[in-house]
């Protein structure tokens, strides 16, 4: 018989830098999960990602206090800010533009996010990322 699922926990943890401090420790501790075991497994799985990039993770906790987790790709907004060299998006994106991204940068981001996007093809994925860029107050060149 399959194990009974008791909780799903969604967090954003910096790649290869998980530690028991908040938000990881309290979120896992209240469900009785071994925090250090999660931190070691997460850090091992995210070794290939640039350290410090926020990585969404969905943790499934079972009734016997065991867990499994699935990592997602870094949010598009973080990748767009990195590509444009910004620390934050525009407070008024329709009127104040804070930076520019090129089609080549959008294609790179779309390739990195492809597994998590529901786009039918690469062109649709690029348009999706371009829409995110515009909503952050970035000018989009070539789309």
From Swiss-Prot:
Description of how the protein assembles with itself and partners: Part of the ribosomal stalk of the 50S ribosomal subunit. Interacts with L10 and the large rRNA to form the base of the stalk. L10 forms an elongated spine to which L12 dimers bind in a sequential fashion forming a multimeric L10(L12)X complex.
Family according to the record: Belongs to the universal ribosomal protein uL11 family.
Alphabetical list of InterPro entries matching this protein: Ribosomal_uL11, Ribosomal_uL11_bac-typ, Ribosomal_uL11_C, Ribosomal_uL11_C_sf, Ribosomal_uL11_CS, Ribosomal_uL11_N, Ribosomal_uL11_N_sf
Organism the protein comes from: Pseudomonas syringae pv. tomato (strain ATCC BAA-871 / DC3000)
Keywords in alphabetical order: Methylation, Ribonucleoprotein, Ribosomal protein, RNA-binding, rRNA-binding
Post-translational modification: One or more lysine residues are methylated.
Role: Forms part of the ribosomal stalk which helps the ribosome interact with GTP-bound translation factors.
Gene Ontology MF terms in the entry: large ribosomal subunit rRNA binding; structural constituent of ribosome
GO BP annotation list: translation
UniProt protein name: Large ribosomal subunit protein uL11
Encoding gene, per UniProt annotation: rplK
Assigned GO CC terms: cytosolic large ribosomal subunit
């Amino acid at each position: 018989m399959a194990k009974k699922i008791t909780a799903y926990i969604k967090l954003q943890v910096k790649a290869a830098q998980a530690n028991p401090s908040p938000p990881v420790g309290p979120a896992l501790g209240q469900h009785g999960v071994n925090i250090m075991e999660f931190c070691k497994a997460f850090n091992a799985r995210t070794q290939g990602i640039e350290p410090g990039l926020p990585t969404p993770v969905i943790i499934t906790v079972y009734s016997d206090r065991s867990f499994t987790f699935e990592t997602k790709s870094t949010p598009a907004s973080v990748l767009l800010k990195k590509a444009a060299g910004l620390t934050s998006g525009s407070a008024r994106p329709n009127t104040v533009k804070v930076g520019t991204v090129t089609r080549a940068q959008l294609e790179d981001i779309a390739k990195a996010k492809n597994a998590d996007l529901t786009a039918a093809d690469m062109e649709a994925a690029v348009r999706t990322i371009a829409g995110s860029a515009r909503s952050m107050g970035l000018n989009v060149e070539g789309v």
